Structures are given as structure tokens and as C-alpha cells.
Amino acid sequence: MAFLKKSLFLVLFLGLVSLSICEEEKRETEEEENDQEEDDKSEEKRFLSLLPSLVSGAVSLVKKLG
């Protein structure tokens, strides 16, 4: 009976450790995805902030040529 008890505790312990590792990896993956989304948004904001100056430069170039 003691052997079964020890085996059961061992199985439960290993299952708990495995579950903990999986949750940690999932959390890290979610953090990386969130960081990537934030980087994409900041790049988009930078591009949109440059857009008016690019348009005004193109308009002035067209006026000089036309």
C-alpha cells in the first residue's frame, strides 16, 4: 500500500511540474506576442507621423515641376 501511495504522489508531483512548465511557456509566448504587437503599433504611428511631411514635400515638388 505504501508503494502505491508513493507512486501516486510521484505521478501527481510530475504532473504538477509539467503543468507549471507549460503555463510558464504559454505566459512567455503571450508576452512575446504582446511585445510584437506593441512594436508594430509604434512603427505604424511613426510612419503616420511622417506622412504629412512626405505629402507636403511631394506637393511642393510637383509645384516646382509643373
Curated annotation (Swiss-Prot):
InterPro entries: Frog_antimicrobial_propeptide, FSAP. It is found in: Secreted. Expressed by the skin glands. The modification Leucine amide is found at L65. It comes from the Eukaryota. Residues 30-41 have a biased composition (Acidic residues). Residues 23-44 form a propeptide. Residues 1-22 form the signal peptide. Keywords: Amidation, Amphibian defense peptide, Antimicrobial, Cleavage on pair of basic residues, Secreted, Signal. Disulfide bonds: none annotated. Residues 25-44 are annotated as: Disordered. One of its GO terms (cellular component) is extracellular region. GO terms for biological process: defense response. Belongs to the frog skin active peptide (FSAP) family. Phylloseptin subfamily. Has antimicrobial activity. This is Phylloseptin-H8. It comes from Pithecopus hypochondrialis. The lineage of its organism: Eukaryota, Metazoa, Chordata, Craniata, Vertebrata. The gene is psn-10.
